[in-house]
């Protein structure tokens, strides 16, 4: 059993998908999708800090998009900056960057196989990607 819950984030330029673990550390469930505006530096950090405190989260896992050759591109740099902003706002929390290559594609495939409509997929894809990121992390620490 974990001492605290773990939050998983899929950070994009317009949304942040959020997933949360159970206290056993076995499963990740989709929690929410935050609307953000990266261009205007509106990153939803205050909302995220509230979610972290309300859910007694001790660790946050942020997806780190890498290129297939393991290099970090533009989206990866943006995720690292997001981590730094979050860490400034809540220094007591552990933040882990997790290789998220293909997590959004896996989430999309899973939703397609479940015959979810395009409109519904668009609403939940980031949350689903956060679930894939967090579940990968949880599986690695078992």
UniProtKB/Swiss-Prot annotation:
Top-level taxon: Bacteria
One annotated GO biological process: rRNA 5'-end processing
Pfam families named among the record's database cross-references: RuvX
Coarse class of the protein's main subcellular location: cytoplasm
UniProt keywords, alphabetically: Cytoplasm, Hydrolase, Nuclease, Ribosome biogenesis
Protein purpose: Could be a nuclease involved in processing of the 5'-end of pre-16S rRNA.
Record HAMAP family: Nuclease_YqgF (MF_00651)
This protein's name: Putative pre-16S rRNA nuclease
């Amino acid at each position: 059993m974990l001492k605290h819950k773990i939050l998983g984030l899929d950070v994009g330029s317009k949304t942040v998908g959020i997933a949360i673990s159970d206290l056993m550390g076995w499963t990740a469930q989709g929690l929410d999708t935050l609307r953000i505006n990266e261009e205007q530096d509106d990153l939803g950090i205050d909302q995220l800090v509230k979610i972290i405190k309300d859910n007694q989260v001790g660790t946050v896992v942020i997806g780190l998009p890498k290129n297939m050759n393991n290099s970090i591109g533009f989206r990866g740099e943006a995720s690292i900056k997001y981590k730094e902003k979050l860490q400034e706002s809540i220094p007591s929390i552990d933040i882990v960057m997790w290789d998220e290559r293909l997590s959004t594609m896996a989430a999309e495939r899973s939703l397609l196989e479940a015959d979810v409509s395009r409109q519904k997929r668009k609403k939940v894809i980031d949350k689903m990607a956060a679930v894939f990121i967090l579940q990968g992390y949880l599986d690695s620490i078992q």
